[in-house]
């Protein structure tokens, strides 16, 4: 074989391999917010418009209740759900009366926490597996569910997490439980929220209750705890201001190494994912509790949004170097910020929608505002970026599409029968959305 032919074949093989890798990435949505946990989808053909009778390939009812997002691999789509045995109105009133600060809470008599699998092609139910049965569960907030954490799908295993009720690994082919870890218990006050993050063999999970606050790594192979690190930052003395519901972000940096970026109450922390050693922490200031949005990162900065009472957005240097004021915080802003939806970082712009429907675009390097506009609805689900556009999914069931640019431009609006609490997923050129009652496959017809 001559050198020129070898070069041509090598280039062709490189293109084929690159295409194959990209196809696998596009075809799977293995965790909360996608392959890179950033809300970005590679598809260029997701529809701009749909309704119950337009661009819906299938629609199937999901048993029980849950806010976990769909995760996808091959022909399988998995969600978690809680099938509740309701209390009577008098029983619920009596149970809640015994709880301090029970405003906004609701409670079930018992719950069956389940992993449910559907065919990506047809929407047919493939598995419905009880993972955990709980009698007399803790109360949850009316905006939460007992199955809010999104599972992780990897190499034929599904890793489901339910906060204080445990973590379970499932064989996706047989539907059999491989292991269960039920040793981590916290008082969430409002129910579970943090999804697991994965780093090599470690499932990294935040446990931030009103009684104890720590981060743990569970071995994905056997379910044993590898490390557990207590939060070190000083917090508000009131226990209800010590809780959090945030998922950790994993940063892989060839120069700086791997980090777990883990928001807790009043502080955002960085940990070594192998050992759990704290690397650095940065303060939000006071009342930085109940944090929900998953951090996003890029250009040496990680963006963290705290949640209730006094929302604050911080751009933190994740290499541990100090900014001009001697802190790790490059810039920060207060005011109208997302309390539940996560943000999108697209090149040098940071996009988000607040719970009350205020959309914003900022310069990610400086925090300066490009635009701020009201969009329809209330929001809990995190936005999606695909093909130059941002999709916003409201609790009322409306999806607003805007261009990802420094000027605000609304492109489309669509509505389905149910509301969105779960964030979307994409596989191939299809969009998968979970409403409060159904799972949909949406694609161009």
Question: What are these regions, as identified by a protein language model?
Answer:
Residues 21-445:
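Noncatalytic, solvent-exposed loop/strand surfaces
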Residues 1-9:
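Bacterial N-terminal signal peptides that target proteins for export
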Residues 8-18:
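Bacterial N-terminal signal peptides
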